[in-house]
Amino acid sequence: MSLKIRLARGGAKKRPYYRIVVADARSPRDGRFIEKIGTFNPLLAKDAAERVTLDTEKAKAWLEKGAQPTDRVARFLDAAGLLKREARNNPKKAEPGKKAQERAAERAAKAAEASEAASAE
C-alpha cells in the first residue's frame, strides 16, 4: 500500500479549504483517508498563522512509515522544518521552442538582407 500525504479539498465553490491527510495513493482525492494531520486555507493571507495548521508529530510519524508527500505538502513540511525540499531550477523554462527560434533566425536574416539592400542603394 503506497501512502501519500496530500490535500483533500473541501469548502464551497470558489471558496477552497483543504485538509492535509494521509491516504492510500489509489483512493480518490476527496475520498477515504487514513488520518487527518492538518489544514490549509488558501484564502487567508500568506503570513497568517492559521493558513497552514499541521500536527508535526503525526506528520513526522507518517514520514517515518514511508508516506510520500505531494509537492504542495512538501512545501508545508519544509516550512515546518520536517523535510528538506530541493528547490526546483529549470533554466530552459523561459527559452522559446525550436520552431520559434527558427522563425526568429529567419526574421533576423530577412532584416539583415533588407538593411544591406537599403544601404546598397
UniProtKB/Swiss-Prot annotation:
Residues 85-121 are annotated as: Disordered. Residues 111-121 have a biased composition (Low complexity). GO terms for cellular component: cytoplasm; small ribosomal subunit. Residues 85-110 have a biased composition (Basic and acidic residues). One of its GO terms (molecular function) is structural constituent of ribosome. The keyword Nucleotide-binding does not apply. It comes from the Bacteria. The keyword Electron transport does not apply. Keywords: Ribonucleoprotein, Ribosomal protein. GO terms for biological process: translation. Belongs to the bacterial ribosomal protein bS16 family. NCBIfam families: S16 (TIGR00002). This is Small ribosomal subunit protein bS16. It comes from Azorhizobium caulinodans (strain ATCC 43989 / DSM 5975 / JCM 20966 / LMG 6465 / NBRC 14845 / NCIMB 13405 / ORS 571).
